[in-house]
Amino acid sequence: MGISTVLALSLLWGPALSQGQWIPYTTYHDSVSSPGAPVETTTTEVFPSGLELRLANGGDRCQGRVEVLYQGSWGTVCDDGWDINDAQVVCRQLGCGMAVSAPGSARFGQGPGQIVLDDVSCSGQEPYLWSCHHRGWLSHNCGHQEDAGVICSDAMAMTSPPPDTWPTTVIYESTPHFPSGLELVFPSGLELRLANGSDRCQGRVEVLYQGSWGTVCDDGWDINDAQVVCRQLGCGMAVSAPGSARFGQGPGQIVLDDVSCSGQEPYLWSCHHRGWLSHNCGHQEDAGVICSDAVPTTTPPPDTWPTTVIYESSPVFPSGLELRLANGSDRCQGRVEVLYQGSWGTVCDDGWDINDAQVVCRQLGCGTAVSAPGSARFGQGPGQIVLDDVSCSGQEPYLWSCHHRGWLSHNCGHQEDAGVICSDAMAMTTPLPDTWPTTVIHESTPVFPSGLELQLANGSDRCQGRVEVLYQGTVCDDGWDINDAQVVCRQLGCGMAVSAPGSARFGQGPGQIVLDDVSCSGQEPYLWSCHHRGWLSHNCGHQEDAGVICSDAMAMTTPPPDTWPTTVIYESTPHFPSGLELRLANGSDRCQGRVEVLYQGSWGTVCDDGWDINDAQVVCRQLGCGTAVSAPGSARFGQGPGQIVLDDVSCSGQEPYLWSCHHRGWLSHNCGHQEDAGVICSGAMDTTTPLPDTWPTTVIYESTPVHISGLQLRLVNGSDRCEGRVEVLYQGSWGTVCDDSWDLNDASVVCRQLGCGTALSAPASAQFGQSSGSIVLDDVSCSGSEPNLWSCSHRGWLSHNCGHHEDAGVVCSGPDSRLAVRLVNGSTRCQGRVEVLYRGSWGTVCDDSWDINDASVVCRQLGCGWAVSAPGSARFGQGSGSIFLDEVSCSGQEPYLWNCSHRGWLSHNCGHYEDAGVICSDGWTTVTPPAPTTDWWEPTVTTTVGPSSNCGGFLYNATGSFSSPSYPGYYPNNALCVWEIAVPSGYLINLGFSQLRLEQHSYCNFDYVEIFDGSTDSSLLGKICNDSGQIFTTSSNRMTVLFRSDISVQNTGFLAWYNSFPRDASLRLVSGNSSYGACAGRVEIYHGGRWGTVCDDSWDTQDAQVVCRQLQCGDAVSAPGGAYFGSGSGPITLDDVNCSGTEATLWQCRSQSWFSHNCGHHEDASVICTGNYGTTTASVPNISTSNASYSCGGFLSQHSGRFSSPFYPGNYPNNARCVWDIEVQNNYQVTVTFTDVQLEGGCQYDYIEVFDGPYHSSPLIARVCDGARGSFTSSSNFLSVRFVSDGSITRRGFQAEFYSLPSNDSTNLLCLMNHMQASVSRAYLQSLGFSAWELVVSGWNGNYQCQRQITPSQVIFTIPYSGCGTIKQVDNETITYSNFLKAAVSSGVIKRKKDLHIHVSCRMLQDSWVHTMYIANDTIEVSEVQYSNFNVNVSFYTSSSFSYPVTSSPYYVDLDQNLYLQAEILHSDASLALFVDTCVASPNPNDFTSVTYDLIRSGCVRDETYRSYAQPSPRVVRFRFNSFHFLNRFPAVYLRCKMVVCRAYDYSSRCYRGCVVRSKRDVGSYQERVDVVLGPIQLLDPPAGKKSPGKGSP
């Protein structure tokens, strides 16, 4: 039986937390020295403001204390956050090789000057230390005892020949060139060796440190660490990295622990580790290594063998490992076989994919992998299976370097032998030589079929045209995009890809179509390196020939020469001219202006073609001007006078220099100075010039890749300037934009460009009317971050395939608009009619398509928990305002309701009788209104607003919450927000923080929250910037909360809550029994002259702890509910109390509003404290039931019923694990309703789970927690409910009811013994436009079995499991039989309706058959799941011939008589196998746990008379045993046998594993587990005088 296991990975996606702020310097230098230039003494390159770097107080210039020359004085760097990445930048900048370590704590002594840098955080790639993120110049919170240091690898190098006594470690790494007179000194003799192995390339890892050899601990030791060791010792590649002292325990010290290498380091000690001689392990964990050059040897290595030698080697793997492809048409395709221990074996296809095949093809020198077929595509191999679960990244040098299950370890058969087809398999025209090696080791450059070339045909020059490949043929445009074109342009040396036209833009090719479904990342070296369908495999015609236009196609003025190569391969190593410098000219300071580069002694400009924020980022970083603010083009800072030195610059933003970016070539351009590029960096000074009064509606800050002057943008035909039809001014005329692929990202760019706030919707289909002008843009695709609309990807100016009926529109929020949502007319703030504040007015939402996902967004936005239901039809009354939204469709993950897809603002086709509502979990009760005698007020509606407007406000509810701007996103700099809270007179206010994360400071001087006891003129209750858990309480009915942030360092901010309570509130305990004393009883609260009670919803010991402390009664012993001390008589004052346990008073805890509840006095809460137990004889009541025996879970098969937690309504036990399986008749659905749920608070402790089928293999419908109620419905006839409790705190538990109703009657599926029966409603077919005669089985070949049977209401198909095209799919856990019904449009030239595909499948799972039916997504989807039992026939037979079954019941036998049993699977599939796992005898057919006798258990024979017989087929099992002696004491006996169903001949499955002693779980896979009960068996009356009967013959 199969167990379907789904592993869900939840990625917590959140903003990275910044530890500091980059503060640029602002001085200006006309020249910047070339990186890498020689330096004098200990200084490196000179930067603006005279920045220099050195290492001081070390043994040489490449180790020491880090010092920076800043403003003319040397200062140090603090070690806060200092690590190997920071040290790497220092070493590179000083030309000192690689970083070896990054010591802190003033390892090289304390420096005398200032501390100039702190909190330095480098990625390791920066060109200069001050390019890294840091706290700011001279800003720190440390002393010189934390001065940072660095040790670089060149600190260990020598410039003079080594002495005769040179250690055994030889370093061949190259030494950088420095000015004469510098000598680099080696530190104290670090060496490396492998000890106690059979040769020098395998053994225990040992390091010579401070003159003694020591070992390395295996904590974290892996193949990457071993790789470094093998390379350092010149021993080839790492084969394995054994730990646990595989090569014996070493005698010396443990010198390294927690070693973590990337695999690229030059020395083992270059890797990250715990520190020298620092460890937490013993020698039993000594690490080892086996390298590929390890070879068996019978003599010890020579005494003079060096322990570390660096040289190149050709790996020869141990024990003669080889690789070949067998049974293919040539050596480059076939079944994968590995020579292991002298024999060829195969590789299993589990997890086998193109990455694995890539390694095989490279290893054999067969080019790149074309495909990775499994399922013994090249026949089943004869030998062993040597590898399984192979998982390669594609970069490994050998197949056995990949991760795998282990040699000769597998769970598969030869029917799963893996194969490979390499690219060179198709180019072989001559037979293979007899001496062809089976394993050839080549360099990693791919070898492709001979003679492959690439060209662009039928274009105006060699860099544009139809893509053709020799194999001469074309490429199909299926999936063809700009990434594919990029590879073509790079391969041909034609610059960057401009566009990737399809549909035979350059004419239809005459030859073959050689490639289809090409999918490139854009980084591949050749087009045929990209993923594709396979050579000459396609499903297209030449009308789909793909084309390319490259950037160099636009600069060609002469025809290409006849000898122009069709494929040009360039070297990827950049070469820069000498003397390059960079500056920004003609701006108000050095950090803004026109970009100029000093090239060949003259300053020149950069063209703005393709110029964007990434390019500007490189400029700003290179000049030390902070981050890029904008990248203006069109000579924003005036036209430059010199040459144009660079054009088509394209940076990723990470490059160290502007000229490191991809560009057209030096002095190569197609532009003029009117397109000079500019940059504005964050380090630029603010301008004081006011903006002109005539500011246009479109301001162009950024340049566009197509250089057209006068571009503008507007929205027309809307109610104001921030909504309407999108129009662009192009070449002097206004034109529209087509709505093809138009979405909210595109609209966001428009709204931001026009200064109109955020995008609310992106209406299409000319919602704002059709224009009469040109259509200037089509197929616009924005990421949402572009500076203007024309920066987005589009089809090209004036290129389109649409009409004005597709004009795109936009609705923006407006520059000063405020959006909010609220729930009105409900009994609490968390239920009611949904209303939205839009442009100053409240309006409703229509219920068309309104569902639980939409409600979820509303509940989360309002802080009301999760959505319980989404009622429509004006459940909460009809609204009176506008209807703002209709056809809302949310995924449930959106932050605000208006982010969901909808029809458009104020666009609807409904009335207020369809107003949508929401009920959230925090408001899912009917609240009893307060009595007229109280002084409580009518609750008001709480609203929440979007991030643009949630900075401050007036709060006037009894309880509520608010947050910092954009929470949980980062709050802005320079924020000042003020919230005023006011409650009725006579009430006080509590304020607490659920989350609080601000910039940290001991005095809260930067970002902080201030709480005032009234207005801001009142006394200060507190000033906080970190989460102390404190609750602030006012002395009046008013409170003011102020939040302020400074100009730097943002964080996620805070989420605050508040509640209110009467000033005269007091507390007591009432027990009615004096023996309990004053510290135990019913909790009562006084207010307004009356005592009231507290409801026990969510009441626990944390709440009780607050009560006990407030009354000075010691600690809480228990928190009984259910009116344990009797029911009170006054009002119910509080409900849903939720204390952390640290509050000073009960009313500081969070709860519902006072007198708001959904309970009665039978739920009054109580407390028992420790206070008086020392002076009373009364015992503490025991309310725990955790030690009592109980029944838990079960199988429910009736039409309806009820179940509950153990001991309900008493407290359930701890550590409960209960599962109820509810199965009803086929084609019915199950609904379960929870009528009472009282569990421990917090859904991670005690909870209920509802599954859509068996719980171990089905999707989770819902997790039900304390206080939640609701109904949940299955999609099939099976539903599981699982209850879990932890080891502490129990409560009353839950009660649930269930019932079943018929599912939809459109489709129906039954999985029977020999076939599946599918029925489709004729009415359903008619509704889709099909007749009953058009529906057929897809694989029907005329077989009468598959013909349809048409009744007046149904079309019925009988589909055998082994015919009519039924497909059988198997894996280790399931067997699935699949087919599908189809109805297609088969006549005419065009069609106006979709084809119909109804997929049907029967899948065997653990305890039942799963029946699924669905319709493919080219039509409406319909799903049905049905469960039924698997059929196995078990019978007694009269003899070992198994010819005649026993038909009588009871079956009367003699004592010790041979009994013969046969079991058989009743199913038409002949490829199933049956196995007897367990057989147990009992005198009671309903109790197999009390008095039992084991015949066989877990496949292990327990009865001496048990004997199995040969199986006539895998689906039949036969065995015998003798009647039992204990039958003398009982009138009858019953057998219960557990049978296991598996795949036949799957020797890894349970059916072929025999006796297995299980300790934790079942071993081996199977498809089905079947429990069978047989009997009764009764003894015959024994003949007189018979005393010792003998056993019968076998």
From Swiss-Prot:
It comes from the Eukaryota. Residues 951-1061, 1192-1301 form the CUB domain. It is found in: Secreted. Residues 1-20 form the signal peptide. Disulfide bonds join 78-142, 91-152, 122-132, 217-281, 230-291, 261-271, 348-412, 361-422, 392-402, 476-540, 489-550, 520-530, 607-671, 620-681, 651-661, 738-802, 751-812, 782-792, 846-910, 859-920, 890-900, 951-977, 1004-1025, 1095-1159, 1108-1169, 1139-1149, 1192-1218, 1243-1265, 1479-1537. Highly N- and O-glycosylated. The O-glycans are heavily sulfated. Residues 1310-1558 form the ZP domain. Keywords: Developmental protein, Differentiation, Disulfide bond, Glycoprotein, Protein transport, Repeat, Secreted, Signal, Transport. Its main location: secreted. Glycans are attached at residues 196, 327, 458, 717. One of its GO terms (cellular component) is zymogen granule membrane. Residues 53-153, 192-292, 323-423, 454-551, 582-682, 713-813, 821-921, 1067-1170 form the SRCR domain. GO terms for biological process: cell differentiation; cell-cell junction maintenance; defense response to Gram-negative bacterium; defense response to Gram-positive bacterium; protein transport. SMART domains: CUB (SM00042), SR (SM00202), ZP (SM00241). Pfam families: CUB (PF00431), SRCR (PF00530), Zona_pellucida (PF00100), ZP-N (PF23344). Expressed in small intestine, liver, stomach and kidney. Present in small intestine and in collecting tubules of kidney cortex, medulla and papilla (at protein level). InterPro entries: CUB_dom, SJ_maturation_regulator, Sperma_CUB_dom_sf, SRCR, SRCR-like_dom_sf, ZP-C, ZP-C_dom, ZP-N. GO terms for molecular function: zymogen binding. The SRCR domains mediate binding to bacteria. Interacts with LGALS3. Binds SFTPD and SPAR in a calcium-dependent manner. May play roles in mucosal defense system and cellular immune defense. May play a role in liver regeneration. May be an important factor in fate decision and differentiation of transit-amplifying ductular (oval) cells within the hepatic lineage. May function as a binding protein in saliva for the regulation of taste sensation. May play a role as an opsonin receptor for SFTPD and SPAR in macrophage tissues throughout the body, including epithelial cells lining the gastrointestinal tract. Required for terminal differentiation of columnar epithelial cells during early embryogenesis. Belongs to the DMBT1 family. This is Scavenger receptor cysteine-rich domain-containing protein DMBT1. The gene is Dmbt1.
